[in-house]
Structures are given as structure tokens and as C-alpha cells.
Amino acid sequence: MRSPEKDESTVEGEYRVIESELPRREPSRGNNRRNASLAGIGALLLFLFTKGKAILFTLLSLLKYSKFLTSGLSMFVMIWTYSWHYGWSYALGIVLMIAIHETGHLVFAKAIGMPVSMPLFIPFVGALISMKQAPKDAWQEAVVALGGPLFGLVAGLAALFWGLANGSQLVMAVAYFSFFITLFNMIPVSPLDGGRIVTALSPLIWAVGLVLMAVGAWYTFSPILIIVLLLGIYRAKQTWNDRYDPERALYYQVKPWQRLTVGVSYGLIAGISAWGVYLFVG
């Protein structure tokens, strides 16, 4: 027989084993999470009250200069894209010439009080600026359009003389690019600069530009030439349809000295640019 003491010990031992196998209740974490959330919200509010004004001012400043950032970024993308085809040096040179061209538009637009956007650079297309308000007459349209080719021509001449003085084939190639782009832009068809310039002379001159563009598109099948041709036809059609509109008639009324200024400027820029191209291909 077992003694009572041993039985009690066995029973007590079994009880202790069973008790140890019961699941223990974990302490609640709800309060801890709630306290942590409240502390985080409080810290965020304190940060916003103390540093929020500075952050807001910084964001507004960046927004103010976002147009410069966008223009600069598109310019970098254009250089990077061209570098894959032409190398970094030539890519920098031709994009610089395009930037100078667009700067001419900006300067002339600011000179007559016309608000315009910063240039947006598009690889294998060029660059463009948008007018935030339409020109009030053909004179204003012509002035803004003249700025780009004029600046581009001056930049091309500077590159030409620099290349000749230093014997740099790279700079000479950049000069040729500037002359060629300037001459191409002087074709009298909208939306090219030449088409906008001759609005101060006579929209009938667009017919010459349309013929030249049609011939070029036919022989090259260039998508850019085709697009320019279609846009030129569209504007010519609009102008023809509005020929009896009194307001549109006023738009094309310019003073004699303005017409003379535009005509002489157009002839000089186109002629010198053609001479520059002839130096390389003639």
C-alpha cells in the first residue's frame, strides 16, 4: 500500500503539471498602441506648428520656380538623348544653339510686354514657348517671331568665327547647325517663325511657304515636314475663312514703318543664314 503522504504528493504534482499547461493570458496591448498613436500625432502637430511655416515657404518657392526646373529638365533630357546619337560635345553645342534661339523669343516678347512661358525642349523636334495671351496684331506676332532667328543667326556667326579662328571642326559643325535651323525656320509658313513674321507683310506669302514645305515633304517623307505642312494649311484656311471679319482685318493692319522693318529684317536674316549654309554645302 502507498502511504497517504505519497498519494498527496502525487496528486499535488499532477495538479501542478496541469496548471502549467493552461494558457496564460497575455497583457493587453491596446492601451500601449493608443498611447503611441497619440504621442505620434502630438509630435506631428508640434512639428507642423514649429517648422510648418518654413516647409510651406520652401514648397511655395519651389512651385514659383517650377517653370525653370521643367525647362532645365527638358533641356537636360534633350542633351542626353542627342548624346546617344552625336556624342556629348556636339549634343551640348546644338542644344545650346536651340536655347539661344528660344531666348531671342523670350527677350523680344518681354520687350513688348507679352507674357510667355519658359521654353520646353523636345528631342528631335526642337523647342517651343507658348504665349500666355494672343498678340493684339500682326506686328506683335512678327516681333516675337523675329527674336529667335535673330539670336540664332548671331550665335551661328559667333560659332563660325570662333571655329575658323581655332580650327575647331566641332564648333564649325555647330555653326552650320545654327545656320540651317535659322534658315529652315524662316520658311514663310505657320507655325514656323517665318510664317509668323510675314503676317506683318501679307498672309498671301504663306502660299510660297506651303509650296516649299509640300515639295520637301514629298521628297523626304519627313514626319516633321508633314506636320508643319498640315498646320500651315490649317491656319491658311482659317485666315481665308475670316477674310471678311472686321476684327481679323484689323489684326493684319500694320504701319508702313513696321512693315518696312519686318521686311528688311526678314530678308537679312534669311539671306545671311542661306549664305552660312552655302559655306558648308556649296
Predicted regions and their residues:
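Hydrophobic transmembrane alpha-helices and their immediate loop junctions
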Residues: 1-282
